Regions:
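Basic, glycine/lysine-rich polyanion-binding surfaces/domains
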Residues: 1-206
Length: 206
């Protein structure tokens, strides 16, 4: 029996790869209101998938996570000032193409969410937030940056996110892009073309 707070199966949100997961035979579950794959039985199940990631490579659909772009409004510096206000790590130290792990906190010091902050340009940042708190986080960011000269854009539904993990992750992805992945250091990223898709960002933040 479903509780009133549990979304009906038809109401579950879906990532752009949902149809592909189903065609490939994934076992789908309700993950925080999203219809997500928990395992692929044809691959041998959870233990086999775990071992594949530890010993080789695994690909995860994390498109349910949120993406918030913050850019300056009419004057330079507005985006940086806003990011400095809402996150704990010092974003002024980030070079363009660099990212860091950070946190958004309530005034009493408890967590709104943990985030990864990417510096896209001198006056542009991308915040990757967790799926379960996506709407809450976006509303909180909008509310707490009202006094800053910046533009807040929710890009969560505009992009598909894949996490490629394991010791062979670089080797796998290198076959799909002309970008030289060996030049991407930990917590750096670069724009690239992957599988012919030009509007792609490759980040080494795992």
């Amino acid at each position: 029996m479903e509780s009133a707070a549990t979304p009906h199966k038809s109401e579950l949100r879906k990532t752009p790869l949902n149809g592909l997961h189903r065609r490939l035979g994934a076992k789908m579950v309700n993950f925080g209101g999203w219809d997500m794959p928990v395992e692929y039985p044809s691959s041998g199940g959870l233990i086999a998938e775990h071992r594949a990631v530890r010993g080789s490579v695994g690909v995860f659909d994390v498109s349910h996570m949120g993406d918030i772009r913050i850019r300056s409004g009419g004057k330079p510096g507005g985006a940086l000032a806003a990011v400095q206000h809402i996150s704990m790590n010092d974003a002024s130290k980030l070079a363009i193409g660099q990212a860091h792990y950070s946190a958004m906190l309530y005034p009493q010091g408890t967590f709104v969410d943990d985030v990864i902050v990417h510096r896209l340009s001198e006056d542009g940042f991308l915040l990757v937030i967790n799926a379960g708190t996506r709407e809450k986080d976006i509303n909180w960011v909008r509310e707490n940056t009202k006094s800053f000269d910046c533009v807040i854009e929710d890009l969560s539904d505009a992009y598909t996110q894949l996490a490629i993990q394991g010791p062979q992750a670089v080797n796998l992805l290198q076959q799909l892009t002309d970008a030289e992945l060996s030049t991407i250091k930990n917590y750096w990223f670069m724009p690239a073309t992957v599988c012919g898709l030009k509007n792609t960002l490759i980040a080494r933040t795992g």
